[in-house]
């Protein structure tokens, strides 16, 4: 038997690849899940590409809020594409093997895209806060330069701070098991196979979650709390409705972003049903990219009209 796939306990060995076993407990029929997952992936690609093209095509959408939405669409495509091709290869062709470098690269990409997405949500929250609470200063503060600098900072911050995750994982010694009960290379799933101490890895993972995603989400919800307080003080029902409509689309995106991962992190059913946290982890990386564009189309009037014009369903985006 190939030493790379057999389970041994010789500490002198160093495995050369991991085996992604797929969804725990349902290996025999997990290929049936490939159909809905493929549809979600195609929806994520098509809908987010439609957002990007629409924003580029319609001059009325050349505003900071829509530029941020376009960047979010790019990140969503990257996040979904990081995991879905390999998952479908496992389900369709039983291609479970993945080299250590490719696995560590996937760990980095998942963490990087996820943290960048969190930062983009923070930028969108700041944009709405200034637009609603400081409307007179909005044109001078939220400019194209502001969007460029903010997104540049977010990408640089998250790109650099997530580098230690795969580096620390690569420094571990993998000498015994190489079978991962997962469809993707999750950091905690990989380092759990290491033969040496992984305390530093777990600590950095926890710190990254709190410092980046935790602080971003705290600021996001604080911003929307202030926005809600300001909106409730408006005398005009029309202005209140418009403000709430704009913010609700953003909040829907954020709930997609945070909802499933909260369930995945808490994984209350992990001991009884290991499938649940693994499946939720997969869904977290494909459902938000697929549903984010739908939430935007339903709640953002200008974007919806832009879709109609681009697809030949409408004549004038300004109507």
Swiss-Prot record:
Entry similarity comment: Belongs to the G-protein coupled receptor 1 family.
Keywords of the record: Cell membrane, Disulfide bond, G-protein coupled receptor, Membrane, Olfaction, Receptor, Sensory transduction, Transducer, Transmembrane, Transmembrane helix
Naturally occurring in which organism (per UniProt): Homo sapiens
Source lineage: Eukaryota, Metazoa, Chordata, Craniata, Vertebrata
Name of the molecule in the record: Olfactory receptor 56B4
Annotated InterPro entries: GPCR_Rhodpsn_7TM, Olfact_rcpt, OR51/52/56-like
Topological domains annotated Extracellular: 1-31, 82-105, 167-202, 264-277
Subcellular location: Cell membrane
Membrane-spanning intervals of the chain: 32-52, 61-81, 106-126, 146-166, 203-223, 244-263, 278-298
GO cellular component terms, semicolon-separated: plasma membrane
GO molecular function list: G protein-coupled receptor activity; olfactory receptor activity
Topology term for the membrane: Multi-pass membrane protein
PANTHER family with a match to the protein in the record: OLFACTORY RECEPTOR 56B1-RELATED, OLFACTORY RECEPTOR 56B4
Segments in the Cytoplasmic topological domain: 53-60, 127-145, 224-243, 299-319
Function: Odorant receptor.
Disulfide bonds: 103-195
